[in-house]
Structure formats: structure tokens, C-alpha cells
């Protein structure tokens, strides 16, 4: 019986309508698939090129006469030359002699050949002569073959199994190509011949049919595509066999219930035997045997008499022949119905008394049968009632148990709720107590401060009284004190506005006495690089920071996670402000920096910062979610589980959108030229290569090998890295690029080592990889220095482009972008690697950037900050960051459409797949070139849904690769002289203020 799989109607509709779904628009056409004719033409061109190469090779060399290959021209041109076996010229392209035609006859008809020089190409089209071997050569060959067989048998060597087939195939090869004149070619064109010049004459010989039987070829094909067939065989999928068993059990249960509800037993409880026999006449012993059988007990024997019929003529044979035995289907055995021994009564002479006895006996049997049937029904009814009572009793016990469990659960919940209320009350009392304690301490501090101020004023009054007494007394010391100047002469600056700003008192501060101890304690708490020289340099840099700039103190040990967040962005170079030159009586001068005035007219002292901004920034950096987020995403401690991270928690720890992604590409705006005349791409690569800790391949290894199974994960990474090379049109169509990734499926620890040992092994491996990448970058730096010294700018530019291509190739792993191309300026635009050409508007690319880097990469971070700072002004106001982040967080959701065609059923349900198809259709219609882009529709399409969160790992990988290769506004030529930034900023503010209007004040993000 062949089992027919039952397919879900929703899946069947999905596969039925899959061919009708429109494909996304492609800017570059895929290379067309080559037809059979095109492939054969390529084979023919390759063969002709080999012939020409061979002709060129042997045209100038002298001809060497040997017994393997010999030109016919040499044989005919030398009179008296002995007959040497000829060989087909086609064999010069083969290494074996399997295509040779062996013949022992020497009476071969020789064709007349033209005398003169014949080119190799003409000889190729000329008719060939078969090879003729003499009897001596054949005997020698046979003897050597036998000797070879003996040696192979001695050393147990295997022979070539298909030598006869190869020889038979080689004999059918015909390398002669017909040569047609112009008239013949015209006639063939008029007839519609496909092969006009006869280039396909070798097709029947090159494409031969396999000699294997059909069954063997089918078996090979099935084994080759076994995995693919299992994916689409719904009968062998998990759950199908269990479903079939469950259906059979359900069917049997229904039949049993129907039988118990209305049993219908047949009239006969025993098998019916219809026996027709042909017996000989009774012998003298037969009556005695019959009496013995009749004398047996009725409990063990039931005599079934034959029907009395007309006596038929009996043959005289002595053997009894059974003609036909029919038996009905046996009923299920039961203890009430046990068939007794059945003995067939032999035929007796019919008489009226025997007929009456037989009818009475039949009635008695029929009555007993009816009585047993009634007893059986009563017993079945009694059992049914008993089972019903037991089932009712079990249901009542189950209901009672559930009610008891529900009561216990409600009691437990009530107790838990009461406990929470008590905890909240206790916490509230604790907070109130802390507030009162704080208020009391503040009151004591105010009292102490007031007391100190009062004592200070009293001391000043006493000092003033002492001076007055001394002055009135007219002492000499007081006169000298009065003669000394008491005021400071102020020299006004050239700017008249400076006099209005002198309202600040200069307070001299000194370093605390325990500064050295505090500094040493700070360096001991945090883990610094093992390089002692580098550590000393960094310490000196920290100490030598000007007092006008804040000291960067990390809030936690972030060196292990390679995430170092600066407390403050590098300040801009401030313009020179007018200074006040103060002179005293001793001709000592000191410079006092004047205050500045901001846009609102409020005066602030120079070289100062807003305290509220610093406090808000410190609170954001010290928030619990931000502080713990780097630990949860550390790629060195354990495997990253993105599905376990809450979306709100992820957003709170991410400025936009991947704050802790190692090896991140900043969304750089490439300028046409800079102040020093270098292209921005060159400056970017120079700054990137000077960054000692950056590497595309090193960062990609974090994303692809986040598992404890080092061997398999490394192999998968190397395979993915090798597959990323080549034509993008071929690479983008590969199925299942995310379902079998190393970091996106649960991996179980198969090692018996402890976690510390495995962690140390992973750290050592990563350190070795880092050292290797650093050595490569150091070598690159040496090469660039040599190019600079030689001033070979062309070679230096080529080297820069090569390095940039490698970096882009590292970031192209599982990325959705086109093949990189390097071009010059065309119409004012410069094409860079990874540039997209979809018809988005400029507003679509508007998103922020993030700064995080290692301590030694501060130069590269400063460079990226200077380039991206003007573009950051295009962002919307702070109160709309949450909406703007969600909008920028989801532009690649709709690009997961290829998962629908490949392997989406491993992650999503059929309903989710339908929803994704609908969203994909909206997305394709949104980015069509003939339609204008609408930001409102884009916001509606790119909203996060529940099924997006269920495929969080795939989504995170898409977004990582998306923002690696997706420049911010690559199609926009950035020009500082235009008013483009102001216009875009104004439009964005108006857009977000109209769509997301909210009169309530924004919530505090921290």
C-alpha cells in the first residue's frame, strides 16, 4: 500500500502560487545561461586553438623519424625507405593507443596522394589511413602483454576495467571535418541546415550515451539528490509516521465504539460447514462405529445431521472426495462462545421417525443458540454500563483534582501578591527613611556652612578692627602698608567688548596631595595592554592632557570586550578670544581668558562646559542597561544569543543601531576632494591602515565563529569566505545563506574541558589571529613608506586600491550588494565599492554614526569624527530619536524575500510567510524607478512585527552586513559651499514634526 502524503492546503497554495509572484527589479541583468549550441561552439573553438597551437609548435622544428609518429610526406619523400606502420594523425592529441585500429593484413589499398608540401591543417581534413602492424609486432605485443599480466598477478595489481569500452569508443572517433565551397554553403543555408560549416560533426562522438543500465543510473541519481528529495518528501518528514499511526488507532477506536453502542451479531455463532461427500456402501463395521459415536457425551460432541435430500446416483469409487468447503470469516473469540467438537453424521436411510427427531433436534439447537445470544447481549450491556460508571468516576476525580490545584495556585498567587505589596511598602519606607536621612544631613551641612561663614565674617571683622586700631595708633608698619598700592592696574584689550566680560574671579587650584596614589590605583584597577612601552605612552598622554579638557575615565573594564566608549567627543579647535593682560605693582603679568557669549546672549566663562550636559552624559554611560550590555554581547566569553536579548534593552544599549559591533564601517560621506587635495577615499584608507586593531576578516570571524566548536566553525567560516569571491550574480543566488550559519543555531558543548580552559583556548586563538592581521598591516605600512620614498604615486594608488578591495571583500560575507568596481569620475560622481544604485531619495540614507574604538585607535576615531560631524547635523531633534532609530533599524526587513523561496519553513509559519510576501510586494512597489519615493509608506512598511522578532538572528545578521556596505548618502556629492545641509535638516524637522506630533514633553531616556 502506497501512502499518500496529506499536504497542508496553505502550503499547497503557497507552492502553487510561487511561480506567479513577481521577482524584484534588478539593475544589472544576470548573465544568460549558455545553450548546448554555445557550449559546443566553445568546445570546437578550444579544439581548433589546440590544433593551431600544435601547428605553430611543430612548424619550425625538424621532423624526427620514429616508429610512433611519422609524417606521410617524410615517408614518400625518401625512396627506399622501409615500410613503417602509419598512425592516425588524430592520435597526436591522445596519450594512449586505444583509438588505433589494429590489422594484421598488409594488403591495404593506398590512395593517391598529391606530391608536394601539405600543411598540417590540410592534413587534418585529409582522409586517414589505418595503422598496420606486422605479425612480428603483434606477437611481440602479445608476449609483452602476457608478461605484464603475469607480473600484475604476482604483485596483485588491478587492471583497467573499461579497456575494451575505451578502445571501442576510440575506434568510433572521426576527426575529419568537411570543407564546403561557397555554393554548397549557400545551398545549405537555403535548405535551413543548422550546422552550415559542419562544425558539429564531432557531436555524436563527443556526447555518447552511458553504458550503465537504467536501474544503476537511477540509483546513482537518487543517491546524489537524496538530501534534496528528503526535503520535499512530506511522507518522510518528522511527524508523518506518527500521524499515520494515530489515524489508524482512531479508526479502530471508532469501530469499537460503534460495535459497543449497537452490537449486531450474526445468526450463526459457529462456522458453517457445507460438506458434500461421495461414500461407498456401508460395510459391516460402519453400524458399530456409528453406535459408538452416538454413545459419546453431548458435552463434547455436537452431531450436525445432513439435510435429507433425494438420493442421487452414487459412483462405485471407494475414495471419499470433498468437493467444496466454504467457511465464513471467524468472529472474535469470547469466553461465552467456545465452539465444541463438530462431528459430521454419516448418511442414514431416511424414515418418518428420523425426520421428526431431526426437526426436534434442530429446534432445540436453535433455541439454545438464541438463548446464548441473549446472554451475550446482556453481558455486553453490563460491561458497557460498568465502563461508563468507571469513566464517570475518573472524570469526577480529575475534576476534583483540577479544582484543588486551581485553589492551591490562587492561594499561592495571593500570597505572592501580598508579599510583593509588603516588599513595595518596605522599599517605600526605606526610600522615605533615606530621603529623611539625606534631608537631615543636608540640614546639618547647611548649619555647619552657616557657622563657618559666621566665624569667617567674625574673623574678618576682628582683623579689620585690628587694622583700624593699628592705623589710629599711627605705627610705622601701618604707614608703610598704606603707602603700598592696593589696586591692580588693568590694561584694556583692543576689543571694547572685553570690558563687559570681566566678571569672573580667577581661583587657583592645586593637585591633591594623594594624586599619585589615586593615579596608581586607577591604573591597577583596569587591565592595560601587555606592551610596557605602549602602556607608558598612554599613561603619559593621560597625565599630559590640558586642564581645559576632561580626563577620559572609563566606567568599567572594557578592554576585554574591545569596546572603549569615550566620555566626551574630542572638542573642536576653538577660535582665539581676546585676553586681558593684568599687571601688578611688581611688573608681573598674567593672562586671564575672557568670557564668551552664546547664541542666547548668556555669558559663559571661556574654556568651560555645561554641567547639565556632562551629568546627563555620565548618567547615560553609567546606566545599568548600558553597563551590562557590553558584557552580554562579549564575543570572547560565550556564544551570543540575540534571541534572548529584549528589543527595548537592545535599543537602550545601542545609539544606532549596532553600537558594539566589532569591525564596524562608519557611514562615511565620501567627498570629492579635501583641503590637502587628496581624495577622501585615499584619506580613509590611510587612516584605516594606521588603525592597528581593525581588520575586516578578523571582525567577520567574530560574527561567524561565535561557538565553542572551533574546528567546524572555522571550516564553515573558511568556506563562506571562499564562496564570497567571484561574480556577485552567481553568489547572490545561493540558497540557505543564513539557515546553517554557525552563530545562528544552538550549539552544544562536546568538549570535556572546563569553561576556563575553553575560554583561554579561544582567547589564545583570537590573539594569534590578531597578531597575524597586525603583521599584515605592518607589512602594508612598510610598503606604503617605500612607495612614498620613491615618489611612485601611480604604484602607490594601485596598492591603495588593492587594499581597499580586500577590505570590501572581507565585509562582503553574506551581504546584499553588487560587485565592487573602481572607476574614475564620470559626470561629477565617483563609484566606490559597495555602492548601491536603488532609486532612494537622499532622506532615506539619513542616519547617525557611532564612535567607539580602542585606545590606540584614537587618531582614526578623530578623523572619522571630523568627517561625519557635519553630516550629524542632519539628524532630527532628540525627542524623535526613538522613532528615527526604529525607522533606520528596519529598512532591510523586506529584503529577506529570498528566504521565502529557499528555507523559510524552518523559522516561520505559513501565515508569517504570507505576511512577509505581502510586505515584500509593498516594498518592491515602493522602490520602483518609475514611482516617486514616499517616506510615509516606507515608515509603514518597515515597522517591526512579531514574526520579525522570531527570526531575530537572521535580522541581526542582515542589518550588520547592510550597514557595513551601505554608505550614508553615496549618491549625494557633498559640497560645503552649498546650502544643502540646511535644506535637508529643515525638511527632516518639518517631516517629523508633522507625522509624529506630540505636545507632551519627551521622556527622559536615562
UniProtKB/Swiss-Prot annotation:
Entry keyword Magnesium: no
Region (Disordered): 326-371
Coiled-coil annotated residue ranges, if any: 358-473, 756-782
Native species: Caenorhabditis elegans
Gene Ontology cellular component list: nucleoplasm
Biological-process GO terms, alphabetical: negative regulation of DNA-templated transcription; positive regulation of DNA-templated transcription
Domain of life: Eukaryota
InterPro entries, per database record: Znf318-like
Swiss-Prot/TrEMBL keywords: Coiled coil
Protein name as catalogued: Uncharacterized protein D1044.6
Biased composition (Basic and acidic residues): 338-350, 358-371
Amino acid at each position: 500500500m502506497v501512502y499518500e502524503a496529506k499536504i497542508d492546503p496553505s502550503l499547497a497554495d503557497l507552492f502553487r502560487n510561487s511561480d506567479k509572484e513577481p521577482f524584484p527589479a534588478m539593475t544589472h541583468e544576470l548573465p544568460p545561461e549558455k545553450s548546448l549550441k554555445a557550449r559546443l561552439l566553445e568546445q570546437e573553438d578550444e579544439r581548433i586553438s589546440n590544433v593551431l597551437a600544435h601547428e605553430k609548435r611543430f612548424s619550425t622544428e625538424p621532423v624526427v623519424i620514429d616508429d610512433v609518429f611519422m609524417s606521410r610526406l617524410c615517408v614518400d619523400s625518401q625512396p627506399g625507405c622501409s615500410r613503417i606502420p602509419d598512425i592516425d594523425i588524430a592520435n597526436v592529441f591522445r596519450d594512449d593507443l586505444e583509438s588505433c585500429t589494429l590489422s594484421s593484413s598488409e594488403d591495404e589499398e593506398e590512395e593517391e596522394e598529391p606530391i608536394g608540401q601539405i600543411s598540417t591543417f590540410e592534413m587534418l581534413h585529409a582522409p586517414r589511413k589505418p595503422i598496420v602492424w606486422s605479425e612480428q609486432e603483434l606477437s611481440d605485443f602479445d608476449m609483452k602483454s602476457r608478461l605484464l599480466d603475469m607480473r600484475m598477478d604476482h604483485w596483485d595489481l588491478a587492471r583497467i576495467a573499461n579497456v575494451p569500452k575505451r578502445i571501442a569508443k576510440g575506434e568510433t572517433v572521426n576527426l575529419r571535418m568537411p570543407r564546403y565551397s561557397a555554393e554548397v554553403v549557400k545551398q545549405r543555408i537555403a535548405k535551413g541546415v543548422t550546422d552550415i560549416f559542419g562544425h558539429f560533426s564531432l557531436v555524436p562522438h563527443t556526447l555518447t550515451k552511458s553504458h550503465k543500465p537504467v536501474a544503476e543510473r537511477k540509483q546513482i541519481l537518487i543517491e546524489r539528490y537524496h538530501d534534496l528529495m528528503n526535503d520535499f518528501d512530506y511522507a518522510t518528514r518528522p511527524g508523518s509516521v506518527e500521524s499515520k499511526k494515530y489515524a489508524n488507532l482512531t479508526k479502530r477506536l471508532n469501530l469499537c465504539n460503534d460495535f459497543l453502542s449497537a452490537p449486531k451479531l450474526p445468526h450463526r455463532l459457529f462456522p458453517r460447514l457445507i460438506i458434500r461427500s461421495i461414500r461407498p456402501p456401508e460395510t459391516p463395521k460402519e453400524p458399530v462405529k456409528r453406535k459408538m459415536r452416538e454413545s459419546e457425551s453431548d458435552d463434547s460432541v455436537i452431531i450436525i445431521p445432513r439435510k435429507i435430500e433425494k438420493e442421487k446416483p452414487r459412483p462405485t469409487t471407494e475414495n471419499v472426495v470433498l468437493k467444496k468447503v466454504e467457511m465464513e470469516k471467524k468472529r472474535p473469540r469470547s469466553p461465552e462462545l467456545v465452539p465444541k467438537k463438530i462431528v459430521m453424521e454419516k448418511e442414514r436411510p431416511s424414515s418418518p421417525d428420523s425426520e421428526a427427531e431431526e426437526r426436534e433436534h434442530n429446534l432445540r439447537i436453535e433455541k439454545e443458540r438464541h438463548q446464548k445470544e441473549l446472554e451475550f447481549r446482556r453481558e455486553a450491556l453490563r460491561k458497557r454500563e460498568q465502563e461508563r460508571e468507571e469513566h464517570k468516576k475518573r472524570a469526577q476525580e480529575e475534576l476534583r483534582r483540577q479544582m484543588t490545584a486551581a485553589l492551591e495556585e490562587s492561594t499561592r498567587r495571593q500570597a505572592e501578591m501580598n508579599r510583593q505589596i509588603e516588599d513595595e511598602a518596605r522599599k517605600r519606607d526605606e526610600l522615605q527613611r533615606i530621603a529623611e536621612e539625606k534631608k537631615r544631613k543636608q540640614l546639618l551641612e547647611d548649619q555647619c556652612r552657616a557657622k563657618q561663614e559666621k566665624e569667617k565674617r567674625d574673623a574678618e571683622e576682628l582683623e579689620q578692627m585690628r587694622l583700624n586700631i593699628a592705623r589710629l595708633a599711627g605705627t610705622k608698619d601701618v604707614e608703610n602698608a598704606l603707602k603700598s598700592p592696593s589696586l591692580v592696574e588693568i590694561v584694556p584689550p583692543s576689543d571694547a567688548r572685553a570690558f563687559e566680560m570681566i566678571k569672573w574671579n580667577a581661583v587657583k587650584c592645586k593637585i591633591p596631595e594623594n594624586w599619585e596614589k589615586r593615579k596608581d590605583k586607577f591604573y591597577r584597577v583596569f587591565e592595560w595592554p601587555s606592551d610596557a612601552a605602549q602602556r607608558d605612552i598612554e599613561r603619559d598622554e593621560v597625565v599630559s592632557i590640558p586642564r581645559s579638557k576632561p580626563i577620559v575615565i572609563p566606567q568599567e573594564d572594557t578592554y576585554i570586550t574591545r569596546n572603549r566608549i569615550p566620555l566626551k567627543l574630542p572638542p573642536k579647535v576653538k577660535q582665539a578670544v581676546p585676553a586681558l593682560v593684568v599687571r601688578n605693582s611688581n611688573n608681573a603679568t598674567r593672562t586671564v581668558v575672557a568670557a564668551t557669549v552664546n547664541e542666547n546672549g548668556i555669558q559663559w566663562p571661556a574654556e568651560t562646559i555645561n554641567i547639565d550636559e556632562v551629568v546627563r552624559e555620565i548618567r547615560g554611560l553609567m546606566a545599568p542597561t548600558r553597563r551590562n550590555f557590553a558584557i552580554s554581547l562579549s564575543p570572547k566569553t560565550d556564544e551570543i544569543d540575540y534571541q534572548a536579548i529584549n528589543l527595548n534593552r537592545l535599543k537602550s544599549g545601542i545609539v544606532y543601531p549596532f553600537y558594539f559591533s566589532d569591525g564596524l564601517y562608519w557611514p562615511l560621506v565620501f567627498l570629492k576632494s579635501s583641503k590637502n587635495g587628496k581624495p577622501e577615499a585615499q584619506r580613509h584608507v590611510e587612516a584605516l591602515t594606521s588603525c592597528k586593531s581593525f581588520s575586516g576578516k578578523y571582525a567577520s570571524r567574530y560574527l561567524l565563529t561565535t561557538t565553542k566548536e572551533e574546528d567546524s566553525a572555522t571550516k564553515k567560516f573558511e568556506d563562506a569566505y571562499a564562496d564570497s569571491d567571484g561574480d556577485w550574480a552567481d553568489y547572490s543566488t545561493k540558497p540557505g545563506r543564513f539557515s546553517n550559519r554557525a552563530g545562528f543555531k544552538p550549539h552544544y558543548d562536546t568538549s570535556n574541558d572546563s569553561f576556563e580552559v575553553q575560554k583561554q583556548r579561544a582567547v589564545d586563538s583570537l590573539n594569534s589571529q590578531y597578531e597575524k592581521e597586525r603583521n599584515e598591516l605592518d607589512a602594508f605600512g612598510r610598503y606604503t613608506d617605500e612607495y612614498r620614498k620613491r615618489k611612485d604615486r601611480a604604484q602607490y594608488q594601485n596598492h591603495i586600491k588593492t587594499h581597499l578591495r580586500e577590505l570590501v571583500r572581507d565585509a562582503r560575507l553574506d551581504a546584499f550588494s553588487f560587485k565592487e568596481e573602481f572607476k574614475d569620475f564620470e559626470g561629477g560622481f565617483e563609484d566606490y565599492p559597495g555602492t548601491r544604485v536603488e532609486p532612494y531619495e537622499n532622506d532615506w540614507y539619513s542616519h547617525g554614526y557611532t564612535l567607539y574604538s580602542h585606545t590606540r585607535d584614537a587618531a582614526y576615531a578623530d578623523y572619522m569624527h571630523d568627517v561625519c560631524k557635519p553630516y550629524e547635523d542632519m539628524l532630527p531633534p532628540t525627542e524623535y530619536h526613538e522613532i528615527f532609530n526604529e525607522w533606520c533599524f528596519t529598512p532591510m526587513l523586506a529584503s529577506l524575500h529570498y528566504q521565502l523561496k529557499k528555507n523559510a519553513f524552518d523559522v516561520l509559519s505559513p501565515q508569517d510567510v504570507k505576511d512577509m510576501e505581502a510586505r515584500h510586494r509593498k516594498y518592491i512597489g515602493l522602490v520602483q524607478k518609475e514611482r516617486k519615493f514616499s517616506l510615509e509608506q516606507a515608515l509603514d512598511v518597515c515597522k517591526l512585527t512579531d514574526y520579525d522578532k522570531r527570526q531575530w538572528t537572521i535580522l541581526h545578521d542582515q542589518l550588520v552586513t547592510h550597514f557595513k556596505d551601505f554608505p550614508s548618502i553615496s549618491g549625494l556629492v557633498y559640497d560645503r559651499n552649498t546650502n544643502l545641509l540646511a535644506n535637508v535638516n529643515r525638511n527632516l524637522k518639518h517631516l517629523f514634526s508633522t507625522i509624529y506630533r506630540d505636545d507632551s514633553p519627551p521622556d527622559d531616556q536615562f
